[in-house]
Amino acid sequence: MDLKQYVTVVPDYPKEGVQFKDITTLMDKGEVYRYATDQIVEYAKERDIDLIVGPEARGFIIGCPVAYALGVGFAPVRKEGKLPREVVKVEYGLEYGKDVLTIHKDAIRPGQRVLITDDLLATGGTIEASIKLVEELGGVVAGIAFLIELTYLDGRKKLDGYDILTLMQY
């Protein structure tokens, strides 16, 4: 199935010159959303995944149905101040400054095989930070899955050494 036909490209959003990839027009078609999810599920099965980790918010949209299909748990990565219990955190760079991502300190057991999911691989900063959180807790990043990769931003370079699945490339 050609998933790109279900992604709406919105010009000049959120700012001029950006070609925003809107996945809601993929997700609102049940059979298409299921197909995309199933591709990631098959990838995960090949890697003997114990847990799915996804950064807010679209990492939840991708990761939760995969976790459900596999019968494994899902651990959210959130911005600082959004998780109620003790967390580990990592600071990461943004285009104009820094931000902090967190995960519950007890979300991952040492040795658990983790699949990190997100909607989009752009510069790789968010996923690089997510990897650091998983590994700090003793998890093994067994794979990383995205719906979309923006190849011209070279985000894959930050993830060198990790196994990556992308369903669409622009």
Swiss-Prot record:
It catalyses: AMP + diphosphate = 5-phospho-alpha-D-ribose 1-diphosphate + adenine. Its EC number is 2.4.2.7. Pathway: Purine metabolism; AMP biosynthesis via salvage pathway; AMP from adenine: step 1/1. GO terms for cellular component: cytoplasm. It comes from the Bacteria. It is found in: Cytoplasm. Belongs to the purine/pyrimidine phosphoribosyltransferase family. Catalyzes a salvage reaction resulting in the formation of AMP, that is energically less costly than de novo synthesis. This is Adenine phosphoribosyltransferase. It comes from Bacillus pumilus (strain SAFR-032). The lineage of its organism: Bacteria, Bacillati, Bacillota, Bacilli, Bacillales. The gene is apt.
